[in-house]
Amino acid sequence: AYQIAIVIALLPLSFLGDMVGYRRIYKIGLVVFTITSLICALSRSLEMLTLARVAQGLGGAALMSVNTALIRLIYPKRQLGRGMGINSFVVAVSSAAGPTIAAAILSLASWQWLFLINVPLGIISIFLAMRFLPPNSAASKITRFDLPSAIMNALTFGLLITALGGFAQGQSGYLVLAEVIAMLIIGFFFVRRQLRMPVPLLPVDLLRIPIFSLSICTSICSFCAQMLAMVSLPFFLQTVIGRSEVETGLLLTPWPLATMVMAPLAGYLIEKVHAGLLGAMGLLIMACGLFGLALLPSSPSDLDIIWRMAPCGAGFGLFQSPNNHTIVSSAPAHRSGGASGMLGTARLLGQSSGAALVALLFNLAGDSGTHTALLLAG
């Protein structure tokens, strides 16, 4: 429910960001996320928790939809790469620390504290946003919000994510096929409507820019490859070579740690090296690490796994900062929100596709699914 809420709301909220200002959308997102976190913790039924998670997803989507647009607004053009690098660093830290912090909370308290911890953090973030975020950007030429486009967007991407999730969870093939067919039909009319809009909610105007569309495609592929590895490897580590859950978590940690190191460095290097060259180098290093993982010996040592995981994370970090920089900077300034929303959508589509592919490969190849997934990711 949380992920679907995010993916259906990213583009409409980024459109509103271009229309009314990124600062306003970001602050609203913080307020909604904080309040709904409290409601999640106080939920007394699964239905109430599900509804609260949907609302929380809308708040999270507001934050994601204008995040990189705000970075572009805050940083001077010559230092935009550093801003993207810092943002990628924060994402990597969250990915590395989140599961560990969640496990620590659950070992000491009830599940409600997974949501309650967001409340003080959210309140602090709201005050910081009010104090430090720059004023709303000047209004763009967008004069109205097209509700039919938002509904068609929600149905198209909602059905796509639901179909991918259902496929990964082994739902009826007929149900998944029906969802895909419905998605294609609605998506066709959605795209046709966007092509007639002066400022489209689905940024087809930006997708006509070759470097923008190429960067979006590579972003989807990179997150798909990441999920192919990060979802399939735990099965291999625990089922095939018998590592414990704690050991598995530690062996996966070099990936985000290496990303934490490389992402800000890549952001700095953008000022000196062409972003396309940095991104290509990052993808090459990541691919080498993934192929190395696919060729693991039958009884690998911890070091065998660690030295292969590290280049995966390093390459991922070296790619993300310049690629995100290219996506945002290639869009006109008044369409930064659309570029930011498309970047978040690409990430979620890549992650969902990767998880669905892992399920398919394990159904087809059994225990050797990890090997196939890593080869495909590379």
Segments the model singles out, each with a brief description of its role:
Residues 1-14, 64-68, 253-266:
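Central cavity-lining transmembrane alpha-helices of secondary-active solute carriers
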Residues 2, 6, 33, 56-57, ...:
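Structural signature of transmembrane alpha-helices in multi-pass secondary transporters
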Residues 8-9, 39, 62, 93-97, ...:
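Residue positions within transmembrane alpha-helices of multi-pass solute transporters
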Residues 15-148, 166, 345:
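Helix-loop-helix hairpins in multi-pass membrane proteins, especially solute transporters
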Residues 32-42, 121-128, 155-156, 185-189, ...:
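Transmembrane-helix signature of multi-pass solute transporters
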Residues 65, 86, 91-103, 157, ...:
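Glycine/proline-centered helix-kink
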Residues 119-138, 154-166, 182-197:
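C-terminal membrane-cytosol helix-exit motif in multi-pass small-molecule transporters
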Residues 148, 172-179, 186, 195-378:
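12-transmembrane solute porter fold
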